[in-house]
Every structure is written in C-alpha cells, then in structure tokens.
Amino acid sequence: MSLSNAPLGQHVAYPSQYDPGLLFPIPRATNRASLQLGATLPFTGVDLWNAYELSWLDARGKPRVAMATFSFPADSPNIVESKSFKLYLNSFNQTRLPNAQALRDRLERDLAAAAGAPVGLKFISPQRFGELNMAELDGIYIDKLDIEIDTYEPAPQLLQCAPGDEVEETLATRLLKSNCPVTGQPDWASLQVRYRGRPIDRAALLKYVVSFRQHAEFHEHCVERIFGDIMRACQPRQLTVYARYTRRGGLDINPWRSNFESAPPADVRTARQ
C-alpha cells in the first residue's frame, strides 16, 4: 500500500463500530532497502506499542477500559501505520463484546494479519493501574556535553571512536527528535545505546543523534538507521539501540534492536511518556 492512501495526515471520520479494515500495513522492506538491509537482519528486536485509551462495551452496554502493550517482532513483514492503529482501537469504543477475552482474540487476530506475524499482547486492567511504574532509561547521559551543532539531517560521518581499550557501557540521551514522514509533526524520544567494543566518542554520538532533528522517518526506521550507522562507524562487537518515543493519539512506540540481547528491558515508561 502507498502512504498516500494511509489515514495519517488526512481527515478521517472516527468509526462507530469495530472495523479491522482500518489497519494500514506498511512493508518494512521498503525502508530497509534504503538502509541496505536484506532478508537476513543484523539484529533481532521488537516494537513495543503502549495503548492508553482502550475501551469497549460489555454485553450489557457498560463501558470497560484497559491499557495494553503490543509487541511487534522486528522480523514481521509489516509495521502498522499509527493513525490507522488508533482508529482501529477506537472502533471498539461502541462495540459490545461478551468479555475481555473476546477483545483479546480480535486484537491478536487482526494485528497478526496486518503485521504478517504473531503480535504479543499484554492487557493491563484498571485494578493494576496503580502498580505501573515510571523510570528513565539507564545509562550515562551525554546531553550536558558542551558542543556546537549545526547539522540537522542524519550525518553518519559524524560518528567516530575515541581512543582507549574496549569498553562495555550504556549511553543515553533525551535529545532525539525526528519527524513524521507524512504530517511533519515532531516525534520526541529518549535513546539508549548499549554496546561492547571500541569506545564511541560521546560528543560525536550526541551530534549524530541531534542530526535527526529535521529528518522525516518513522520511529522504527530511525532506530534501525541508528543501529546500522553505529555498526558501520565503530564496529562494536555487541550493540543494542532502544528508543522510547512520546505518546501521540493515545499510543507510544518504543523500537528495540540488538545483536546480542535476547529480549528488551521491562516496558517502563519515561517521564515524558
């Protein structure tokens, strides 16, 4: 499907009843071709989506609410365009269902069909809302480095290694900003880079991250671009790149890519989320 046909950036009426046809898949392969990524990926990963505005009607017409976390595997053929996902979830608002399991069954079936692979789903009931925590990404934050920046489109040539022996460290920043490729709206994120290898020059990394500031690309694609650029520039033996983007339309998206870790960290939202 062409992005020109996606609901993002268009005036679309909110649905009144359940409609799985609202989901708009976008092939991952299209963007990955520009990153020189083929069928064999240099990483594993997931895209963690948190839905904060999930509601439906029970069999007697009484509203129910919950939150949910969806895990889209990075090797699925498609991502789902975010506005279409929001509209799809909102199509349950006036839909009667016998129980929460019926909702779960529809979500799992429909999202797997759109993504082209099984999608993990975790429900969070109102009884558990009080258990939810908030925390910042761990790591050494590089935001206070005293540097001058004048590049605001992705510039992988900025990346470089620093002198020194091999290290194992985690670096983090709250200064990642990219833009929606359809609407131009800003996308804000915290970024974590965990690696083992030659030291990454921290000032160079910060300049590189900031260079995304006027770049238009989906969240998932930005993280894969960052992963590939760091691998080519510094060739770490181990690398994980993880971004937590702020919420839009009741959804936040948190892509995680790694060539050595088997599972992402706990899905804990940051203060800005």
Swiss-Prot record:
Q: In which pathway does it act?
A: tRNA modification; tRNA-queuosine biosynthesis
**Where found?**
Cytoplasm
- Look up the EC number in the record and give it: 1.7.1.13
Q: Which SUPFAM superfamilies match?
A: Tetrahydrobiopterin biosynthesis enzymes-like
Q: Source species, please?
A: Bordetella parapertussis (strain 12822 / ATCC BAA-587 / NCTC 13253)
Q: Which GO terms describe its biological process?
A: queuosine biosynthetic process; tRNA modification
Main localization (coarse): cytoplasm
> What are the binding positions for substrate in this chain?
80-82, 219-220
Its recorded name reads NADPH-dependent 7-cyano-7-deazaguanine reductase
Family, per the entry? Answer: Belongs to the GTP cyclohydrolase I family. QueF type 2 subfamily.
Keywords of the record:
Cytoplasm, NADP, Oxidoreductase, Queuosine biosynthesis
Q: Which residues form the active site?
A: 180 (thioimide intermediate), 187 (proton donor)
Q: Which reaction does it catalyse?
A: 7-aminomethyl-7-carbaguanine + 2 NADP(+) = 7-cyano-7-deazaguanine + 2 NADPH + 3 H(+)
The function of this protein is: Catalyzes the NADPH-dependent reduction of 7-cyano-7-deazaguanine (preQ0) to 7-aminomethyl-7-deazaguanine (preQ1).
Q: Name one GO molecular function term.
A: preQ1 synthase activity
* One Pfam family from the record: QueF
Subunit relationships: Homodimer.
Question: Can you tell me which residues bind NADPH?
Answer: 82-83, 248-249
Task: Give me the Gene Ontology terms describing cellular component.
Answer: cytoplasm
